[in-house]
Amino acid sequence: MIKKSVISLVSYDANRFLAKSIERYYEYVDEIVLGIDKDRVTWSGNPFEIDEEALWNELSNIDGDSKITIIEEDFHQSKVAIENDNYERNFLKGECSNDWVFSFDADEMLV
């Protein structure tokens, strides 16, 4: 059987969407790698805040099979937002242990 990984990004809209998004694909994948900027800064360099305690609790409740890994890294190294986007997605992809890697934004739902 082919094993599947998912990467997703934790940012300003994570409390609204991320857990719901993950719930839609959780049972179909073997690994979920989430990236969050260590300084809580967007790719454009703007600070953001989320309710981390609530989010981590929500993700913990979903993650009965221990599939979720959270990576904290400096994902705003460039002054060009799209370069930071590419860097983060490629970095997270490199952390995956499976050959099939899917990328879902927090506000994207698998139907």
Give residue ranges: language-model regions.
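Acidic beta-strand-to-loop metal/phosphate-binding motif
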Residues: 33-35, 103
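Short alpha-helix within the catalytic core of nucleotide-sugar-dependent glycosyltransferases
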Residues: 19-23, 98, 111
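N-proximal low-complexity "stem/linker" segments adjacent to membrane-targeting elements
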Residues: 1-27, 34
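Short catalytic-loop micro-motif centered on adjacent basic/acidic residues
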Residues: 7-9, 102-106
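Acidic donor-binding/catalytic loop of UDP-sugar-dependent glycosyltransferases
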Residues: 90, 104-111
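Short acidic, S/G/P-rich loop/turn micro-motifs used as interaction or catalytic elements
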Residues: 14-15, 40, 108-110
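Active-site-proximal specificity loops/subdomain of glycosyltransferases
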Residues: 37-100
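Short, well-ordered alpha-helix to beta-strand connector turns
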Residues: 29, 96-99, 106
